Structures are given as structure tokens and as C-alpha cells.
Amino acid sequence: MKRETCSTQKHTFDSSNNSYHVELESIQYVDEIEIHWNFRYEYKYEIEISLDSIHWVKLSKGEYVSSDLVSRNIIRANTGYIRIKLADQSADRFSEAMKHVLVYSGTAAEFIKGVDVSHLTQIEDFGGKFYDRQGRERDCLEILKEYGCNYVRLKVWNKPGLPNSDPAGYNDKAHVLGMAKRAVDKGYRLLIDFHYSDWWADPGKQFIPDDWKDLSLEQLNTALYDFTYEVLNALKLQGTLPEMVQIGNEITNGMLWDVAKVSDEFDTPEQWDKLCTLLKSGISAVKAISESIRTVIHIERGGDNEKSRYFYDMLAERNVAYDIIGLSYYPIWHGPIKDFSSNIRDLYDRYSKEILVAEVAYPYTAENGDDQLNASSFPFTNIPEEYPPSIQSQADILQAVIYELKSIPDNKGIGFFYWQPDFIPVKGAGWKYGEGCEWDDQTLFDFKGNTLWSLDVFKLHS
């Protein structure tokens, strides 16, 4: 079958940075390019793409190597400009070697470009404001929508409030209903993230809700089902039915501790049975609301294949019928892109499930916007040398994650959610009541709420 080529305006060499430029007639979806060489050689090169020829993003995690006369490279992005940079040859050598480049169009698969904005209302209530790249004050959700964001992720806490270190009224059922309506009215689709806790739930803490702490396993099973059903039914009744629902948040070590904890001395068949029984209850509640809602089981081991396989094997052995594998992947904690890439490919091969990056973020600065220690400064953090904190690195990392997701066969890498792109430093609206924000260096807005150009990466992808 004949492939359609994109309309290109001009092809030029740039000797100043040893690169070959292709300018398209307009921003178009490019499926792949073919580089035709005049003679055989082991060429090492990078590919960059841009919407405006000012801000460039690396297509993937590193160099391409080719010794063929024709090199085919998958792009799968919307772009107006393509730049091929030869890594180890002089400009003269490059211009002699390069024959021409063909640019092919295609049909883009649906792709999730989501944001978790669970704390947006709190940030706004305490005075946070957001500005577009023209300096105009705007609704944060409207700015994100203009860059192509199409999903909002909202977490649900059972009964937040002191003494659980966060003000009541945020991330509870009523708050989620309000945010869901606001997001859907602006054209977003929804993922609802049940923490099954009154506060943060992650691998280091899965505090059982205070109202559930004295329940037996059987009673807990019923309470989890009822709470899940109640929240989702309320969303359904107001016309904001979610597309996806997470049963638990980063539950690598289990949830509802210690009842369904599965780490350390709790890593026993009996404990895994308890966890999977509870997961099945949550899934049943979701499907009772609508069979169309896809369920996500989410862990935080984006770069750890051994632990990921162990976790999802335990679920497979117990016939947990979920739809999507959800992973957190923070490069500063979870290892290099190559580890993430090999993990998601193996998980797809092993379980034939769709793969979703439920959380991702990266620092755009080494500065701190307030006096709260940033999460990127924690002792176990490892900033990759090739990606020093900068807007450019933030854009390149996000594009690399997307590239790997789109490389999974059959379009099974379905997308990502950027975690708290709006968490700018606003007094009183930090991660914990009365404290500052430990995430202000990983947002998609600067400390004053101005939009960063790294949001262009969202626009690159359909």
C-alpha cells in the first residue's frame, strides 16, 4: 500500500550545529521518516522535533545508529519541523552523506495526555494564579486544554481533615464531584483515583481510613465496595462518569495497612489473598456502575521489572480481572529511561494489558520556590546526568516517556498523566496543612504561575 508523504516546504543543512532541517508546510502528523544516504557508513545521529523551530525536543532517549542506505525512524507526533543532528561527522561529511529525507504521514491513534490536578482548588483558594505565555491570567485548566491535555485525574480520600494533616473539604467526595464537573465542562475526560485512605496513600504509607480501622476483613470488603459505588454513582448521576478508575494508589506494598499489606513480613500468600479480595470488590463496584469503565491497578515501579512482574504475577495467580497496568515513573527515583522501556515492553508481552503511566514529572529547575524541602532533594533521589534540571530536560524526558509508550505494539501504550503540574508554591496550599510545597520544581508553571514551554510536548501528540 502506497504511503502518503507530508507536504514539506524546504530542506536545508545547518553547518553551525551539523544538522539537516526539514520544514513542513504546516504542523502535521508525521508517522515516520526515511533518511536516504549516499554511501554506507555507521551513522550516529539524533532526531529533534519542534512546533515553532525555536523550542526543540529530542524525539527519543538517545542516539540512532544506522549503517543502511535507508534509515527508517518512527516519529508518531504532530510537528512542523524536524532536525537530524549527526553526532560524529563534520558538516561537510554530513552534507555529502545525506541524499534526501522522506516524511510520511499517517493516522494518529488516540493517546491520553492527562494531568493530575487534585489540589488545584486548594491552590486557587489560597491565592494561586496561572498565566499563559502571553502573560494573561487564565484558568489553569483552560491553559492546559489549549496545549492538548485531554484527561484529568482526581484522587479521592475517604474523610480528609485534621488531624490527618490536610484541611477538610479537599479531595473528599464533594470536592471530587465539583472538580469533575468543572473538568468535564471544559472538555476533559476523567480518571478517578481511589486512595482508600483519609490522606496520602503511596508505597511508604497506606493508612486505613479512620472509620474503617476496626472492621473485619469481610466488613472492610463491603465498606470498600460501598464507598467505591457511592462515589461513582454520584459522578454518574451528575453526568460526569469517568472513563477509568484506579483501585488503590501505588499499591506495590498493598493497601489498607495492615489488613492487606504485602511487604516485608506481610509478603505471604494469605496477605496477597486479602489484597486481591479487596481489589476484586473495588472492580466489582466499578463494573456495577458501568461495564464501560476501565479499571487500573497502579504501582510505582516504572523502572523495576522484577518487582513489577512479581506484583502483577500475584494478581494473575488470583484472577484479578483488571483492565490496565498503571505505573508511576519518576526518573529521579525510578531509574533511567532504558529501564522504563524494557519494563513496559515486558509487562505488555507478559500480560497483554494496556500500559498507562499514571504519574510522571521532572524538575525544570534546581531552585526552590519556598522554604519547604523539595522532593527532588530527598536522599534517594538521583538526577540523571544527561538531564540536568531545566525546562529543556523536562520536555525531553516527557517526550522520551511518550516515545517508549508509543513503541508498544498495537497502540497498547495508551498515555500518561503528569502529576500536579499546577503545584506552584502558595502559602497554605502545600502537600501538608501548614507546610510549603515540595513539588514546585516539577510543575509545568514557574513559581509565579507562568506557563513553561515544556507544555509544547503535549501538543506534539494526538
Describe these PLM feature segments.
Residues T107-I143:
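Boundary/entry segment of secreted carbohydrate-active catalytic domains
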Residues T5-A108:
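Aromatic, loop-rich ligand-recognition surfaces of beta-strand-rich domains
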Residues V117-L120, W157-K159, H195-W199, I247-T252, ...:
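Active-site beta-loop-alpha junctions enriched in small/polar residues
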Residues I123-G135, P160-A174, T252-M255, E300-R309, ...:
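Acidic-and-aromatic substrate-binding clefts and catalytic sites of carbohydrate-active enzymes
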